[in-house]
């Protein structure tokens, strides 16, 4: 059925305006982004098919240009638009952290770190450098490694923290295996970094491990 023949209250845009964005399904949200369908499929049918083909919205969003454009009705222009939306979302989360106390918005912190690290194929060690009010000064990937390990050098972390004049750090890294449970090696390097940074009066506030659909906090476990 053409989407124009659907009841007005069931159309994605109208439904969003009347009930809010959280009332929409993944396919309905994607339909608003896509705007039009293809020959033989209205935009909702196309959205539903894309999500099923990729397995989830997340896998659709992390698809390469070639993978995305291989689907009927999807071209370079739509791929560019999607990447722009994702980048704006990431910047919004980063700005939210930089304007306030990172520790008063743990859900934003986890969401931001997950968006940065979750889909990486190799392990990456990421640091949020904070001022004395726990606001983000700078965030960056410090180390990248193989598919299952990243070498972390405490001396380099200390140098970078001093360069940014940081008062505290939040650490994060991903597990490409998808299993977020911290390893003994994760706990050891956290202790080494804590000890090294303490020599220059810089604290580690938390260490997050990002897996597939889960982010584990050392602080919440009482390990920091």
Swiss-Prot record:
InterPro entries on file: MPN (IPR037518), RadC_JAB (IPR025657), RuvA_2-like (IPR010994), UPF0758 (IPR001405), UPF0758_CS (IPR020891), UPF0758_N (IPR046778)
GO biological process: proteolysis
Gene Ontology molecular function: any one: metal ion binding
Domain of life: Bacteria
CDD domains according to UniProt: MPN_DUF2466
Domain MPN: 102-224
Database matches in Gene3D superfamilies: Cytidine Deaminase, domain 2
Residues that hold Zn(2+) according to the record: 173, 175, 186
UniProt short sequence motif JAMM motif, positions renumbered to this chain: 173-186
Disordered: annotated segments: 1-21
Keywords from the named record: Hydrolase, Metal-binding, Metalloprotease, Protease, Zinc
Key word Transmembrane present: no
One Pfam family it belongs to: RadC
UniProt record similarity statement: Belongs to the UPF0758 family.
Name by which UniProt lists this protein: UPF0758 protein VS_0182
């Amino acid at each position: 059925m053409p989407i124009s023949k659907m009841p007005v209250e069931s159309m994605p845009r109208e439904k969003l305006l009347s009930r809010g964005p959280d009332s929409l399904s993944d396919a309905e949200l994607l339909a608003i982004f896509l705007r039009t369908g293809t020959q033989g499929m209205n935009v909702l049918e196309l959205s539903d098919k894309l999500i099923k083909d990729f397995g989830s919205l997340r896998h659709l969003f992390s698809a390469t240009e070639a993978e995305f454009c291989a689907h009927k009705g999807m071209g370079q222009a739509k791929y560019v638009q999607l990447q722009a939306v994702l980048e704006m979302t990431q910047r919004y989360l980063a700005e939210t952290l930089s304007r306030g106390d990172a520790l008063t918005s743990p859900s934003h912190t986890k969401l931001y770190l997950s968006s940065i690290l979750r889909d990486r194929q190799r392990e990456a060690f990421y640091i949020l450098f904070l001022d004395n009010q726990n606001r983000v000064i700078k965030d960056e990937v410090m180390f990248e490694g193989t598919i299952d390990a990243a070498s972390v050098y405490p001396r380099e972390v200390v140098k970078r923290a001093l360069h940014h004049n940081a008062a505290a750090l939040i650490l994060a890294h991903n597990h490409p295996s998808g299993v977020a449970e911290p390893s003994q090696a994760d706990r050891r390097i956290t202790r080494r970094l804590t000890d090294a940074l303490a020599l220059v009066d810089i604290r580690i506030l938390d260490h997050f491990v990002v897996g597939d659909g889960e982010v584990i906090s050392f602080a919440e476990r009482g390990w920091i």
